[in-house]
């Protein structure tokens, strides 16, 4: 194959956040024509740029492609290539394909199994297609990457369990209550953790979200994001009987909720169960609350145990996912190698079609004019014959080429056998001379040729 796949990139493992910011390409959404132009050995390009990685996927010719990309990338950010080089990795050929499949399956993410990377890859591909910078190779590779990612999520549990504190908190609530659409939740505090928890609660279908925050305006802002209701912090215990799930993350120096407060709340709730999740440090909720009947209290240490247990489970599932990635990389590699066959297959069909057309014209001259429908029927018949004659030889070529390292020998033999390169015929004097046996590839029919 005259073209090769390269991936040139950096990520959260090879570069800290300052370096990633310096060389990010998010400002030019995948690429503008001036950043990584086609040409100079580059025939296809896609750029993925996120907060945790920049990866430039290229199909091109020549050993200098990575250096060309590196220079263009650095120049686009107003930096010298040597400033970028220490942080960059380069994958080539099937190693590049396997790397992409690994990334798409979220096996290379900072949080193993997180789903965002697949969407980011799809956005990068969509942008490249819109800019007309992809062709057969990268198009096929990206679609295969999406298929591999789907297979990994379907056949493994690599993304099935909570690995963030906020997500784990909501997952615990779901275990207690089951379906969440009949239950109401209250967030005490309106910081980042509360915002993440609200997102997960909403995704789980919780009936309503209340937000209690010392700064009412901030609570109101968060509540509006999730179609919830902000309440004054002073009204906290007045409104608590209405809710079933409480997630607290105020960062206060003393407990915000004490056991005696919850006893009164439970009486007003007629002892219906309540679920408290304290993700604040120092803790917002007095641990004695957990001694009350029909109350479930978890603090951040409990959640960390859940997260670590789930991460361990994800790591086990990642081993299965990597086996899928390796298998699919081999499949893609066979397709990639089969591209070498395409010119020969096209030439075989072209030569046979040309001969068929010549013979059709001879026949028509001999039998005289025919009507248009008859001529179309004859042409369709000849095309069908050409396809059927070539079906078995082409299947044979593909099988041998995929299965054996010496695939080029089969291409060479097919080209000689069908004289696709228009080599001159043997002179008349040599026609009756016994020919030496050609060095046919193993498995070819007709080992003896007179």
Curated annotation (Swiss-Prot):
Homodimer. Residues 422-450 are annotated as: Disordered. NADP(+) binds at residues 189-194. The active site is at residue 51. NCBIfam families: hemA. PROSITE patterns: GLUTR. This is Glutamyl-tRNA reductase. Catalyzes the NADPH-dependent reduction of glutamyl-tRNA(Glu) to glutamate 1-semialdehyde (GSA). Pathway: Porphyrin-containing compound metabolism; protoporphyrin-IX biosynthesis; 5-aminolevulinate from L-glutamyl-tRNA(Glu): step 1/2. It comes from Oleidesulfovibrio alaskensis (strain ATCC BAA-1058 / DSM 17464 / G20) (Desulfovibrio alaskensis). Possesses an unusual extended V-shaped dimeric structure with each monomer consisting of three distinct domains arranged along a curved 'spinal' alpha-helix. The N-terminal catalytic domain specifically recognizes the glutamate moiety of the substrate. The second domain is the NADPH-binding domain, and the third C-terminal domain is responsible for dimerization. The keyword NADP applies. CDD domains: NAD_bind_Glutamyl_tRNA_reduct. During catalysis, the active site Cys acts as a nucleophile attacking the alpha-carbonyl group of tRNA-bound glutamate with the formation of a thioester intermediate between enzyme and glutamate, and the concomitant release of tRNA(Glu). The thioester intermediate is finally reduced by direct hydride transfer from NADPH, to form the product GSA. Disulfide bonds: none annotated. PANTHER family: GLUTAMYL-TRNA REDUCTASE. It comes from the Bacteria. Pfam families: GlutR_dimer (PF00745), GlutR_N (PF05201), Shikimate_DH (PF01488). Its EC number is 1.2.1.70. Substrate binds at residues 50-53, 109, 114-116, 120. Belongs to the glutamyl-tRNA reductase family. It catalyses: (S)-4-amino-5-oxopentanoate + tRNA(Glu) + NADP(+) = L-glutamyl-tRNA(Glu) + NADPH + H(+). One of its GO terms (biological process) is protoporphyrinogen IX biosynthetic process from glutamate. It is an enzyme of class 1 (oxidoreductase). InterPro entries: 4pyrrol_synth_GluRdtase, 4pyrrol_synth_GluRdtase_dimer, 4pyrrol_synth_GluRdtase_N, GluRdtase_CS, GluRdtase_dimer_dom_sf, GluRdtase_N_sf, NAD(P)-bd_dom_sf, Shikm_DH/Glu-tRNA_Rdtase. GO terms for molecular function: glutamyl-tRNA reductase activity; NADP binding. Keywords: NADP, Oxidoreductase, Porphyrin biosynthesis.
């Amino acid at each position: 194959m005259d073209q090769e796949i390269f991936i040139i990139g950096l990520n959260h493992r090879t570069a800290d956040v300052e370096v990633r910011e310096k060389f990010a390409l998010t400002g030019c959404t995948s690429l503008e024509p001036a950043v990584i132009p086609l040409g100079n050995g580059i025939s296809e390009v896609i750029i993925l740029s996120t907060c945790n990685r920049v990866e430039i996927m290229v199909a091109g010719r020549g050993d200098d492609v990575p250096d060309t990309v590196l220079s263009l990338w650095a120049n686009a950010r107003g930096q010298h290539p040597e400033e970028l080089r220490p942080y960059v990795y380069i994958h080539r050929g099937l190693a590049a394909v396997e790397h992409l499949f690994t990334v798409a399956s979220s096996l290379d993410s900072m949080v193993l199994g997180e789903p965002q990377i697949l969407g980011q890859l799809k956005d990068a591909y969509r942008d490249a297609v819109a800019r007309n910078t992809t062709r057969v190779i990268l198009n096929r590779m990206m679609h295969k990457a999406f298929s591999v990612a789907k297979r990994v999520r379907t056949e493994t549990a690599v993304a099935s369990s909570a690995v963030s504190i906020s997500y784990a908190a909501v997952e615990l609530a779901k275990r207690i209550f089951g379906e969440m659409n009949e239950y109401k939740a209250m967030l005490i505090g309106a910081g980042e953790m509360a915002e993440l928890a609200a997102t997960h609660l909403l995704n789980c279908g919780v009936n309503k979200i209340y937000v209690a925050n010392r700064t009412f305006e901030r609570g109101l802002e968060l509540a509006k994001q999730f179609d919830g209701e902000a309440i004054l912090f002073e009204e906290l215990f007045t409104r608590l009987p209405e809710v079933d799930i409480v997630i607290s993350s105020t960062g206060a120096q003393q407990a915000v909720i004490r056991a005696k407060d919850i006893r009164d709340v439970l009486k007003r709730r007629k002892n219906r169960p309540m679920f408290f999740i304290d993700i604040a440090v120092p803790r917002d909720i007095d641990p004695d609350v957990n001694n009350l009947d029909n109350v479930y209290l978890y603090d951040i240490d409990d959640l960390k145990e859940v997260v670590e247990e789930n991460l361990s489970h994800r790591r086990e599932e990642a081993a299965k996912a990597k086996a899928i990635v390796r298998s699919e990389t081999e499949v893609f590699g066979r397709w990639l190698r089969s591209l070498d066959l395409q010119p020969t297959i096209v030439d075989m069909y072209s030569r046979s079609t040309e001969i068929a057309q010549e013979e059709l014209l001879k026949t028509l001259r001999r039998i005289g004019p025919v009507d248009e429908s008859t001529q179309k029927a004859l042409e369709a018949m000849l095309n069908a014959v050409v396809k059927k004659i070539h079906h078995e030889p082409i299947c044979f070529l593909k099988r041998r080429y995929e299965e054996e390292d010496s695939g080029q020998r089969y291409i060479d033999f097919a080209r000689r056998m069908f004289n696709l390169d228009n080599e001159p015929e043997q002179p008349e004097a040599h026609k009756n001379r016994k020919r030496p046996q050609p060095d046919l590839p193993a498995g070819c029919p007709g080992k003896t040729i007179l």
